[in-house]
Curated annotation (Swiss-Prot):
Organism name: Arabidopsis thaliana
Keyword Coiled coil (UniProt): yes
Stretches for region Transcription activation domain: 445-620
NET domain residues: 270-351
A GO-annotated cellular component: nucleus
SMART domains the UniProt entry points to: BROMO
Protein name: Transcription factor GTE11
Biological-process GO terms, alphabetical: positive regulation of DNA-templated transcription; response to abscisic acid
Length: 620
């Protein structure tokens, strides 16, 4: 039996070896060299009596119970520190000052103090980073192909005997998780080194064209991207060692109850002062990504937020931003969720401004025959078509879902088909009566669309009637056959009538289009005509009328006026060149006025005397 004597709290075993059998004076007890300042005593069990054995068993049990209680108290104070399982007393790490070893080891033996290594101080930032490492490892192990790296490599099962020859330091994520849980890692850098070693071993042993190599490369990039985020957060924060770490450096030899209570209150006070940070779960993160992906157009607030939280390498262009939602911190994710919820609330307010349109089916009453929707007037002009007098748009009628395996589904189809049949029958009834003027007022495009909608729903109605007939199995087969034949005949007539209406509507639409084209052509011609009339004149056609007015003036002027003008006017006037004298200037130019009484003399002038021939232009 080997017994280590160390100075436990309170020196409760100071005289534990002073047994009646004389532990210190026993000639059979051999004392070995001291290890770590603790004397070691070897007791042969064969030389001990039964009473001495019982005494030793009782003493060792008491020491073991006290050791366990001490270990539990240290574990409560240091939750992140190394937790040592129940092993022999030689493997228990003790604080610095446990007191002096007081065991009497015989005459001439010197007493050595118990010296222990100083534990590394644990800071608040280190505790937070270790928690982040644990969450990152969980996310990494939940990836698609990560199961290949969760367990150690089995060289026998995989038939790779040379694995340990190539890989000197094997590692897997399962081992990393066990080390992280047991508190083996003293810093996050050790954790990241083991994770990188796992993927590096896989990429070293397997060729680059192997799937395991590609999976390891992908998971390594996944880890590195998220590890950089943790490093960025922890690099700027420097916190002093917490009170939990400083407690390990103090003497814990039988602490007084009052002091212990004071320390626990200080720890609780510090924990209350720290603000609780919100953490977004993986499900909420995936839901947020789906909600953002469903947006056809991102609002300005979300675009600015993503641009602020994205690095320059992630921006492929001015208008395109690529960002991984898993890279964002929890605070950023909650801010993004708040922006998205605010955007949805604004859209709901805009949609609620539209007035509700109640759509009721004809010949029916009850909640199943009306549909309430929020719509704007502009949408009704483009999409909705009125059929008949007081009919509502058929495009808002929900389609019938056929459920072959359930009776409730057939009943719903029958009710819906009856409602649609009453709608179309009401339309046909109104067309023959008072609704004829109303239908003529509709544009050809809407009438054509109404005919198409009627033709489309006719098959659904007739099929629903066939299903209704097939359900009545208890009725007379002859009656059912006759009703089916009548239904087929009605179906043919209905199709023929609807096709004729569609043709008429198409013809009316074509005529309306031709009239519209003709009207546009007339408008274009009229516009061209007005443009020609408004054009500026480039040539004056009546420019020579001024000369005629001047000649008229010369004709009517008398001799005195002409003489006065001649005396007063200058040579530049142009009148001096004419030697008119006192005669008519027109006659001077050879121009004569022909009067009616001179018509008789024209015959005499036609044959003049050859001897007295007058030159042309001469006045007699």
């Amino acid at each position: 039996m080997t017994v280590r004597n160390g100075g436990f709290p309170g020196d409760y075993n100071r005289n534990s070896f002073d047994s009646p059998g004389g532990c210190d004076d026993s000639p059979n007890a051999s004392k070995d060299d001291e290890t770590f300042g603790v004397p070691r005593i070897v007791l042969p069990l064969s030389d001990l009596s039964s009473s001495e054995r019982r005494k030793w068993i009782h003493t060792l049990r008491q020491e073991l119970e006290q050791l366990r209680s001490f270990q539990k108290s240290v574990g409560d104070l240091l939750p992140i520190s190394k937790i040592v399982t129940s092993t022999p007393a030689s493997n228990v790490s003790r604080p610095k000052s446990f007191g002096m070893s007081r065991c009497s080891t015989g005459p001439g033996k010197r007493v050595l103090p118990f010296t222990a290594t100083k534990p590394e101080p644990v800071t608040t930032s280190t505790m937070l980073r270790m928690k982040q490492c644990e969450s990152l490892l969980k996310r990494l192990m939940s990836q698609q192909h990560c199961w290949l790296f969760n367990t150690p490599v089995d060289v026998v099962k995989l038939n790779i005997p040379d694995y340990f020859t190539i890989i000197k330091h094997p590692m897997d994520l399962g081992t990393v998780k066990s080390k992280l849980t047991s508190g083996t890692y003293s810093s996050p850098s050790e954790f990241s080194a083991d994770v990188r070693l796992t993927f590096r071993n896989a990429m070293t042993y397997n060729p680059s064209d192997n799937n395991v190599y590609r999976f390891a490369d992908t998971l390594s990039k996944f880890f590195e991207v998220r590890w950089k985020t943790i490093e960025k957060k922890s690099s700027g924060t420097k916190s002093e060692p917490s009170n939990l770490a400083t407690l390990a450096h103090k003497d814990i030899a039988i602490p007084e109850p009052v002091a212990k209570k004071r320390k626990m209150n200080a720890v609780k006070r510090n924990s209350l002062l720290e603000p609780a940070k919100r953490v977004m779960t993986d499900e909420d993160r995936v839901k947020l990504g789906r909600d953002l992906g469903s947006l056809t157009e991102f609002p300005v607030q979300i675009i600015n937020f993503l641009r602020d939280h994205s690095s320059k390498e992630e921006r492929s262009g001015d208008d395109e931003i690529e960002i991984d939602i898993n890279d964002l911190s929890h605070d950023a994710l909650f801010q993004l969720r708040d922006l998205f919820d605010e955007f949805l609330r604004e859209n709901q307010k805009k949609d609620s401004n539209g007035e509700p349109c109640v759509l009721e089916l004809l010949h029916g009453s009850g909640p199943g025959n009306s549909l309430t929707q929020h719509c704007d007037g502009s949408e009704l002009e483009d999409e909705d078509v009125d059929i008949g007098n007081y009919e509502h748009p058929i495009s808002h009628i929900s389609t019938v879902r056929t459920e072959k395996d359930s009776v409730g589904g057939l009943n719903q189809m029958e009710d819906a088909s009856r409602g649609k049949l009453s709608l179309i029958e009401g339309a046909d009834g109104h067309q023959d009566g008072n609704s004829a003027p109303k239908e003529k007022e509709l544009p050809p495009e809407k009438r054509y669309r109404a005919a198409l909608l009627k033709n489309r729903f006719a098959d659904i109605i007739l099929k629903a009637q066939e299903i209704t007939l097939n359900q009545n199995e208890k009725r007379d087969p002859e009656t059912l056959q006759r009703e089916k034949e009548e239904l087929e005949l009605q179906k043919k007539k209905e199709k023929a009538r609807l096709q004729a209406e569609a043709k008429e509507a198409e013809e009316a639409r074509r005529k309306a289009e031709a009239q519209e084209a003709k009207r546009k052509l007339e408008l274009e011609r009229e516009a061209a005509r007005q443009a020609l009339l408004e054009m500026e004149k480039s040539v004056e056609i009546n420019e020579n009328t001024r000369f005629l007015k001047d000649l008229e003036l010369l004709k009517t002027v008398n001799t005195d006026q002409l003489r006065n003008l001649r005396d007063v006017g200058s040579e530049s006037d142009g009148l001096a060149v004419f030697g008119f004298g006192g005669s008519n200037p027109l006659e001077q130019l050879g121009l004569f006025m022909k009067h009616e009484e001179d018509e008789d003399e024209s015959d005499m002038l036609a044959f003049p005397d050859p001897g007295n021939e007058v030159e042309e232009g001469e006045i007699d």
